[in-house]
Regions:
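Short C-terminal tail/terminal secondary-structure segment
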Residues: 138, 217, 228-243
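Residue(s) in the substrate-gating loop at a strand-loop-helix junction
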Residues: 133
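Active-site loop immediately N-terminal to the catalytic Tyr-X3-Lys motif
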Residues: 90, 138-144, 166, 204, ...
Length: 243
């Protein structure tokens, strides 16, 4: 039921952090994994890496066309890649805003559209998993590009889940809390910020990237055959904790 053995899987942002953990986890579970990222993986594994500039929609299209023409038809797409560029909103540069939209939203839609199309045309009942953030459930200051794009992805997921359900395609979000990844290294390396974020959870600690693998395999596999359009929160109790 929880098997992804033999499934073709595309993962963006698979060079480090959560994306790398997903690439290693799915390949260890027997999936055929292709990772897309602008940089090669920090750790070599039993998966294929393809250079892809996720801020360039034309390049994404070229890469996907090559993957599909080689006969790799995905059953699972995981959009994990993202950029975070913090700055006060009243001083936020247009270049950072556009980069956030390009990588965090445009790339997600392009990948969903192209993979969704080939799933539909190939009659594949597949699974698309988009990573959002606890920042779409609460207000986080000084990062408008990240907040806006992740919020948009949340709603895109729900729209696609409704539209593509008739084709047997499930589309869901994973909502991670603070995770020990290179993206969060500034907060992780600051003892005060690390403790503040740890204390906000029920477990008193951050997540490790590997803790996102199980939820992703659940959503990718037949174990979630009747689950679509949901936000699967993996935050150590951040959102539910009160006083």
């Amino acid at each position: 039921m929880f098997s992804v053995d033999g499934d073709n899987v595309i993962i963006t942002g698979g060079s480090r952090g959560i994306g790398l953990a997903l690439a290693e986890g799915f390949s260890s579970a027997g999936a055929n994994v292709i990772t897309l990222d602008i940089n090669p993986p920090e750790v070599e594994g039993n998966y294929n890496y393809i250079n892809c500039d996720l801020g360039n929609q034309d390049h994404i299209q070229v890469v996907l066309d090559r993957i599909f023409s080689d006969g790799f038809i995905p059953k699972v797409l995981i959009n994990c890649a993202a950029v975070t560029i913090p700055a006060p909103s009243h001083q936020y540069p247009d270049t950072d805003w556009r980069k956030s939209i390009s990588v965090n939203l445009d790339a997600v839609f392009t990948l969903c559209r192209e993979v969704g199309r080939i799933m539909i045309n190939s009659s594949i009942s597949g699974s698309i998993i988009n990573f959002t953030s606890i920042g779409v459930e609460q207000g986080f200051a000084n990062n408008p590009g990240y907040a806006a794009t992740k919020g948009a992805v949340k709603q895109l997921t729900k729209a696609l889940a409704v539209e593509w359900g008739e084709h047997g395609i499930r589309v869901n979000n994973i909502v991670p809390g603070y995770t020990n990844t290179p993206m969060n290294s500034k907060s992780w390396n600051n003892p005060l910020l690390r403790k503040q974020r740890s204390d906000r959870t029920v477990f008193g600690r951050w997540a490790e990237p590997e803790e996102m693998v199980g939820p992703a395999i659940f959503l990718a596999s037949d174990a979630s055959s009747y689950v679509t359009g949901v936000d699967l929160v993996v935050d150590g109790g951040w959102l539910v904790k009160g006083m």
